[in-house]
Amino acid sequence: MSIEAPTQAPKPSVTLAEAAGRKAMRRLLPFLLLMYVLAFLDRANIGFAQKALLHDTGLSDAAFAFGAGVFFVGYALFEVPSNLALHRVGARIWMCRIMVTWGLISAAMAWVQSPTSFYVLRFLLGVAEAGFFPGIIYYLTQWFPQSSRARAIGVFYFGAPLAFIFGGPLSGLLLEMHGTFGLAGWKWLFLVEGGLASAVGVWAFWYLVDKPEDARWLSPDERRALTSAIQLDAREAAAHGPRDALAALFDRRVLAYAGIYALIQMSVYGVIFFLPQQVASLMGASVGLKVGLLAAVPWLCAVALTWIVPRRADRLGGHRAWAARLLVMSGVGIAVSGLAGGLGGTAGAIVAMLGLCCAASGFIAAQPLFWTFPARDLAGAASASGIALINSLGGLGGFVAPMLRAAADRNFASHAAGLELLGLASIAAALLILVVAPRAVAPAARSFEPPVRRAR
């Protein structure tokens, strides 16, 4: 006579997988967050250095906009090869390589003397950093199942606002070191922030663990439970998504997500690259510590919303609807910041800052939700190449955004025109998400069983 196992048997494995996931969050996410903070600092520090850099090197506004964007050309060209290399050699080795090389190139920005050297170093910085962001997203899919993935990516995304909360004042202080040891403040900015990236890259080699089954800080049962949960997601993704790295590059869903992400990145970088100067204009001050502190306010709002929304979506579902709402809010906020800033006076400045708070909160909090959509359709090498392609093509939005904003302002003789255009891009992304993204992501209610050992 056979005895059936109780129907509630999977519950302990659910608890075990969740416990292992919480351990992984505590162990990995603070370090990944630090890495992303440094990545964002190295991308956006030219926004703080802009005025002094242009003054000392003679670059024009158009040359600066092109140089700010050419980063994304190198980034896009080498994104997919870089992520496939990470899939092959592991995050520990590849993230070390990425961070050390981009830190050295960022520090070399201190020796920019002409438009040509500016373009070359910005392009090389993109090449060096290629694969960092999609590599981390792919890495998180190897550590966290779908039921907790938005929360994990959401914590990682804190890096963007935190880079401005702490990076704004830090950049302001470094700029005020002008003349120390005979170096201009903007040179100190690149040297210090680039050096920090290289140092953390070396640390990453010793700290990161490639896969749950290699984590000594998890018990054997926890390793099995977490690995089982992730493998279940991978099998489901492989069943209806592209089966290999090459197929993912031509998959219609992947290309559609890349188009959506490009629109999101247009709004993100069209704001980020000019935010310090926009805040300085509202204050009637030059970029420094005070401007850095005020420029941190929108990112404080972004941290709060990014903490709340992905957790709510993982618990209750509705990733698609939340992402669309946040991007509409962001688009309206971007446009309002430009229109109100042109009114002048204290009231106009306050409304413009509120608009920037809505803009930053919306486009930062929406992105962890966005990345759960392609992750449900991709697994293995297809996941590595597909995520890289989305980020690569999407990053081109960051390339064109500064130039589109500058061109719109110039052609319409209005500093609000470019921001209105970027706001429309964010709203268009929201509408496309409603068309392309899956209608629902089930709340975290799945069971994961570790492999069952046969009785001997």
What is each PLM-predicted segment?
Residues 377-412:
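A late C-terminal transmembrane helix in Major Facilitator Superfamily
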Residues 78-91, 304-318, 409:
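Helix-to-loop junctions at the C-terminal end of transmembrane segments
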Residues 58, 90, 111-117, 128, ...:
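Helix-breaking motifs and short loop linkers at transmembrane-helix boundaries and internal kinks
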Residues 121-158:
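Cytoplasmic helix-loop-helix junction between adjacent transmembrane helices
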Residues 319-373:
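C-terminal transmembrane helical hairpin of 12-TM major facilitator-type secondary transporters
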Residues 46-47, 248-306, 367, 371:
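Extracytoplasmic gate region of multi-pass secondary transporters
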Residues 152-175, 196-197, 391-401:
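Glycine-rich segments within core transmembrane alpha-helices of 12-TM secondary carriers
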Residues 77-116:
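Conserved MFS/SLC helix-loop-helix module at the cytosolic interface between two early adjacent transmembrane helices
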